[in-house]
Amino acid sequence: MSGGIEALELKEDDIRLMVAAKVHLGSTNANYQMQQYVYDRNDEGNHIIHLNKTWEKLLLAARAICAIENPADVVIIGGQPTWQRGALKFGHYTGTTSVPGRFTPGAFTNQIQSGFKEPRLLIVCDPKGDHQPVREGSAVNIPVIGFCNTDSPLQCVDIGIPCNNDKYSIALMLWMLAREVRRIWGLDPRSQPGDVIMDLFLMREHVDEPPEGPEGEAQEPPFEQGKFDAAEAEAPEWPAESVSPRCWNAGARFRWCWWQLDSLRCKG
């Protein structure tokens, strides 16, 4: 899709980002339809994706998005938690409709449903994981753009972008796709970095830190595993009146069944 135009060619900085995010590193399995995008295979058995073909498919997907008059008619779905932030930021910078989290079945085919949508273009982060919206989109003639790994099926996918679809690779690819869409629209010039920030597309990992004391030092937790001594523990004292010498079933009410009553009558 670059057509030999220098402005549309893959830059060296973008190649470094793609290699750092492991966009080129596919899985150990490869679908027969994805073999055309595989460049080689490393010693660990992972398939290496051709980055030039990834860039060409990215340009094609950006042109398909820009062909839609209303950006809100483009729906992007991020099924897994690691893709939700990237899907939300992509919708924020491009004006598309983002659906983070679980996709409700029937959202494209059931008109009675409250969340029914009629998009003109669908973007999924994983055609294999998000197979439900892909199949519903194909049933109602919605074009599908998917970020496909080497083991992803291409059935019902119109534009497949070959790349690794883990959290870092998907964040980078969504950022590059949003940047290219804004460049085609004329919002961001190609000579400048633009307003789209890459770090906002990454999923933040929450790390639990120990509480700090009054002097800023980390406090020791009140109980640690392995420090409990059963010999030092004091056994509770039971009161003498808690156990009664009488029968345990004294005062209990018995409910007789009809067959038990008949047996007593026969004996009498």
Swiss-Prot record:
It holds the Pfam family Ribosomal_S2. GO terms for cellular component: cytosolic small ribosomal subunit. GO terms for biological process: ribosomal small subunit assembly; translation. It comes from the Eukaryota. Its main location: cytoplasm. The keyword ATP-binding does not apply. Transmembrane segments: none annotated. It is found in: Cytoplasm. GO terms for molecular function: structural constituent of ribosome. Keywords: Cytoplasm, Ribonucleoprotein, Ribosomal protein. Residues 161-179 are annotated as: Laminin-binding. PANTHER family: 40S RIBOSOMAL PROTEIN SA. Required for the assembly and/or stability of the 40S ribosomal subunit. Required for the processing of the 20S rRNA-precursor to mature 18S rRNA in a late step of the maturation of 40S ribosomal subunits. Binds laminin. Component of the small ribosomal subunit. Mature ribosomes consist of a small (40S) and a large (60S) subunit. The 40S subunit contains about 33 different proteins and 1 molecule of RNA (18S). The 60S subunit contains about 49 different proteins and 3 molecules of RNA (28S, 5.8S and 5S). Interacts with ribosomal protein S21. Belongs to the universal ribosomal protein uS2 family. This is Small ribosomal subunit protein uS2.
